[in-house]
């Protein structure tokens, strides 16, 4: 459980922390890219997803963070990414330990420049995307311009800059 006063960008920050943990454990730049709002990709394939559940407990918001990392997938699911081939430089236990340390540090100290760090690792920054609403029927086409301090998507459509708070994005050629 994690306590924080600004829960909005939590899945983005956790994705950033996981990407940083991969680099630090491996000792090299893994190039795990971030996809709004909660996915990590390597070579344009999803290797990790994040889910956040929240509860209100008195005056506190409490969060449960679920992290799924693909370490060993069957060949028939090859459209997903798998970091099992990186196991010599990303041992599972070391990666988990590093992720937990980074999340704990963030919970206690915050992350000052998380927005610019997230945008640097974003795989669709400045690209044309489809922003899909949670009901999957509505969508907007436009250029991904970044995120605001609350982790909301900034999408430049033909006529305006829209702020999108939930849903997902689809990038041509990725998923």
Predicted regions and their residues:
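Long, positively charged amphipathic alpha-helical accessory segments at protein N-termini or as interdomain linkers
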Residues: 3-4, 12-30, 42-175
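Glycine- and Gly-Pro-enriched alpha-helical subdomains that act as flexible
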Residues: 35-36, 41-42
